């Protein structure tokens, strides 16, 4: 318990680093999380409480244990992007996975396979930089949405993207009145987005403006300068609400190239629309795909692709099936899936259905789908929150024989697997790390229905 006098200062020593890559210390029985810290660091901790809010803590560094690893980025601890450049990658991966490893051993008597990152920098295929008056171009400040840290380069995006960022910074310096001022509600340019394919050479640059900039003399002048200065294969202007803080969304104008870029995954071509989600690190995600390819059993007819998006998994593994059913809630993504599947695999019986899997109305449709055959293989790649109660309930009564559960949040994944433990047996689990310098992981669990016999 905290002292009644919340203004008292206490001293706390960091004891360990948790899976979120934050140092953990204690004041009496109260846990303190400290970013950018390591075991042995000592802090003065002063608690304070605002009305109707939980107590907060002010931290003051007293002493710091010797660092053996120097962060390569000068903006580290100021920029809100990376959180672990002060930790060697080997230790990062150990911190991120150790608690998961132990909990799977304890709760499921299974040892996950761990696959660390092969590339720890220059791996992301998309970065969104806010543009503020100054001009300032950068990422949100750690712990603050109102301020950004000016960045000349970013070590987790590609070198080609950094070259384009350099060109843009030189360009925008000649237009000091163009950046949108959130305080005075003046100016036009809000975001600068870079999307660089990993397995092709294509680069896309997207500039997001307020709607009022469209069809102005200033827009035409800036368009001409962009075409002369920027080198991306695809250059787009995007226009959306003045008060909206969303990048690369809205009405577009194509200055150069197309509104999508080409990426290759497992030898298959994907057209990635300017405003759509795609795996941030396709190279780092490849172990997940290799795992599924190896474990998919032979002689199964039907693939069910839940949370299918634009049909990423369907297209990669379609050659193993006679029929594919994809389900998602976003019609624009489903249209892409239908079009690409009909082009790539015209002889496969494929259908992509619009269903909100987090709505109770999905229950009846899922139960019909999951009870159709013993020859079904399921791949599900849900959002961070997990499968949701309606998918879980449908799976408990299903005839699905084999189930691949892909997750960007292994913690919620493990919680879902515990709820399914009486119905499915975990065969194998792979945990991999496409996102070094951050606390995020990707994992895939391969499950077999308990009452299924081959």
Swiss-Prot record:
GO CC, alphabetical: membrane
CDD domains reported in the protein's UniProt record: AdoMet_MTases (cd02440)
Biological processes annotated in GO: rRNA base methylation
Keyword DNA damage on entry: no
Residues given in the record as S-adenosyl-L-methionine binding sites: 279, 307, 328, 381
A UniProt-annotated Pfam family: tRNA_U5-meth_tr
One Gene Ontology molecular-function label: 4 iron, 4 sulfur cluster binding
KW DNA repair (keyword) present: no
Active site: 408
Top-level taxonomic group: Bacteria
E.C. number: 2.1.1.-
Binding site residues for [4Fe-4S] cluster: 73, 79, 82, 154
Enzymatic class: transferase
Keyword terms, alphabetized: 4Fe-4S, Iron, Iron-sulfur, Metal-binding, Methyltransferase, S-adenosyl-L-methionine, Transferase
Family: Belongs to the class I-like SAM-binding methyltransferase superfamily. RNA M5U methyltransferase family.
Name of the protein this chain belongs to: Uncharacterized RNA methyltransferase LIC_11085
Organism: Leptospira interrogans serogroup Icterohaemorrhagiae serovar copenhageni (strain Fiocruz L1-130)
Lineage of origin: Bacteria, Pseudomonadati, Spirochaetota, Spirochaetia, Leptospirales
